[in-house]
């Protein structure tokens, strides 16, 4: 009764739905909902998808951002990121501190970062045979802020990359024809739609996807 929001730790998606069905007087935010240790974050889409159907569910926090590791040299003088147990200490939590979506040290993106990046995107592209539906989930930003590139590949090999002019207003959607038609020759064709920064920002260079 004294808080402005409801917060729980690692509830299931169904538990969140059940809670909001009984009491939606406050927004629901998971104080922690995925643990980015090892090869993880594979099911987080179930939670991010929930934001599309439950307005009072407003997301959550990942544990955590950066591996809690430090530089150490091995016996050959080569640096590596060390964690529990690498200094001969006992007891220890071993690699339990290595649970970030960015590596320690230079903070390079780990493979888990790609999963997080995809699920946190504010623009969705739904591709059909000859068109693409662009859904803009941004609250204030038009899609013309970005350069939209559409890439056609066959059996994993890029055939063409074209620019698609889009201008989808915030919280709306629009369908555009693809710059290439339906392919007739046999093979597995894939279409990749990317939105890239037109200009450099404080957090990324121009061209960042």
Model-found features: residue ranges?
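Extended substrate-binding grooves/exosites of carbohydrate-active enzymes
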Residues: 1-131, 138-144, 149-157
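A short, sequence-level motif marking secondary-structure junctions
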Residues: 10, 166-168
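Beta-strand-rich binding/interaction modules
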Residues: 131-166, 175-179, 187-197
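Short beta-strand elements
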Residues: 200-209
């Amino acid at each position: 009764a004294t808080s402005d929001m409801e917060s729980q730790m690692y509830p299931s998606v169904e538990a969140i739905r059940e809670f909001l069905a009984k009491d939606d007087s406050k927004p629901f935010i998971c104080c922690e909902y995925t643990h980015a240790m090892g090869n993880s974050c594979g099911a987080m889409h179930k939670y991010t998808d929930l934001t599309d159907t439950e307005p009072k569910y407003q997301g959550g926090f990942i544990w955590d951002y950066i591996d809690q590791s430090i530089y150490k040299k091995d016996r050959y003088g080569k640096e590596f990121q060390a964690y529990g147990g690498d200094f001969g200490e006992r007891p220890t939590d071993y690699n339990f501190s290595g649970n970030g979506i960015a590596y320690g040290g230079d903070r390079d993106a780990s493979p888990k970062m790609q999963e997080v990046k995809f699920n946190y995107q504010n623009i969705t592209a739904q591709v059909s045979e000859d068109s693409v539906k662009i859904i803009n989930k941004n609250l204030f930003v038009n899609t013309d802020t970005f350069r939209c590139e559409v890439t056609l590949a066959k059996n994993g090999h890029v055939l063409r990359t074209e620019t698609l002019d889009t201008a989808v207003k915030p919280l709306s959607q629009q369908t555009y024809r693809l710059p290439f038609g339906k392919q007739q020759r046999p093979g597995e064709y894939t279409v990749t739609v990317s939105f890239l920064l037109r200009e450099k920002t404080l957090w990324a260079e121009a061209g960042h996807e």
